[in-house]
Amino acid sequence: ERKSPAGGVRKRITDADGEVYDAKELFDAYTRFGGMPMLADIGLEIDRVTAALDGVYSAAVVNDILEREKRKGQRTITDAVLLRKIIMFLADNIGNNTSATSIGNTLVNEGLLEDGKRKTKPAVQTIQAYIGALTEAYIFYEIRRFDIKGKEYLRTLGKYYIVDIGLRNFLLGFREGDSGHILENIIFFE
């Protein structure tokens, strides 16, 4: 701890190597790179973080979703490009009320389907199946509003949160801004 110029106390943290960090500096790193355990081993160099998060994403999406679907023989999730577009949409809209219909409309209106197999708007049931696969793989979590008095879920739109904010930032190119939704996502998991 040390006194700040404003008279308050600033927390300082020392790592195993004796390196001293300011608590705000560590929080800023967490909101940017997330809290995946391997980051403690590889450090916070952007190239290494990007490679590690790409590995997590590839393992979760390719192995946990696409390969699992093949093994189950259901073949519900067949379009890897559509899956990625839905992931990108949800990552970009954490904490927003979201529906399968709004995802489909956005993908079509913004021309986001033109580089995949699909040229038309996917069915709502298809988008729901893809979102279901993402929540089953624990990449995203859906939160629905609950009426405490009526003891039932409301029929309003749900919100989605991503399992690790670093994964979201990796997917969206580590862009700046959107701190409100980033903080909301972090608080959801605390």
Mark where each language-model region is:
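Accessory nucleic acid-recognition modules appended to NTPase machines
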Residues: 41, 45-190
